[in-house]
């Protein structure tokens, strides 16, 4: 597999876990404005080395998910801001421009040190 993007969660905002109950995980790179940081999983920003598209594999810690849809600005947001909203609903069409949809259950064991990646499943 080819890694397209990899980063490590460094902090978890006080309200970030609440979004998981709505099947949503919101990330932002370190240095996010304080009012946003409260709702985000903060990470040390990695380099985006390819395009985000359906068919990639998203992983968080030991959990693996197929990417089913990518919003029109999700790739730019990730590249520039380290920001992406992940939805664990398996939709085949992005609900919002900044959203990446994946299929599978919401992870319940996210902690600082968890590695987040997007990988190509084809060589």
Swiss-Prot record:
Regulation: induction: Regulated by an unusual system which consists of the activator GutM and the repressor GutR in addition to the cAMP-CRP complex.
Modified residues (Phosphohistidine): 43
Gene Ontology biological process terms from the UniProt entry: phosphoenolpyruvate-dependent sugar phosphotransferase system; sorbitol transmembrane transport
Subcellular location: Cytoplasm
Pfam families, per database record: PTSIIA_gutA
Domain (PTS EIIA type-5) ranges: 3-116
Active site: 43 (tele-phosphohistidine intermediate)
Gene3D superfamilies, sorted: Phosphotransferase system, glucitol/sorbitol-specific IIA component
Impact when changing residue 92 to S: In strain: ECOR 51, ECOR 61 and ECOR 66
Chief subcellular location: cytoplasm
GO CC terms, sorted: cytoplasm; transmembrane transporter complex
Entry annotated with the keyword Transferase: yes
GO molecular function: kinase activity; phosphotransferase activity, alcohol group as acceptor; protein-N(PI)-phosphohistidine-sugar phosphotransferase activity
UniProt cross-references to PROSITE patterns, sorted A to Z: PTS_EIIA_TYPE_5
Keywords of the record: Cytoplasm, Kinase, Phosphoprotein, Phosphotransferase system, Sugar transport, Transferase, Transport
NCBIfam families listed in its UniProt record: gutA (TIGR00849), PRK10377.1 (NF007696)
Entry note about domains: The EIIA domain is phosphorylated by phospho-HPr on a histidyl residue. Then, it transfers the phosphoryl group to the EIIB domain.
Function according to Swiss-Prot or TrEMBL: The phosphoenolpyruvate-dependent sugar phosphotransferase system (sugar PTS), a major carbohydrate active transport system, catalyzes the phosphorylation of incoming sugar substrates concomitantly with their translocation across the cell membrane. The enzyme II complex composed of SrlA, SrlB and SrlE is involved in glucitol/sorbitol transport. It can also use D-mannitol.
Name under which the protein is recorded: PTS system glucitol/sorbitol-specific EIIA component
């Amino acid at each position: 597999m080819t890694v397209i993007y990899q980063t490590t969660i460094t902090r978890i905002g006080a309200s970030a876990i609440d979004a998981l109950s709505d099947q949503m995980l919101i990330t932002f790179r370190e240095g996010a404005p304080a009012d946003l940081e409260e709702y985000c999983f903060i990470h040390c920003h990695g380099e985006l080395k390819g395009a985000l598209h359906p068919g990639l594999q998203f992983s968080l810690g030991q959990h693996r998910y197929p990417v089913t849809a990518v919003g029109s600005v999700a790739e730019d947001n990730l590249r520039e801001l380290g920001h992406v909203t992940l939805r664990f609903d398996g939709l085949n069409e992005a609900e919002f421009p900044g959203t990446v949809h994946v299929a599978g259950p919401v992870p319940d064991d996210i902690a600082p040190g968890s590695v987040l990646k997007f990988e190509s499943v084809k060589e």
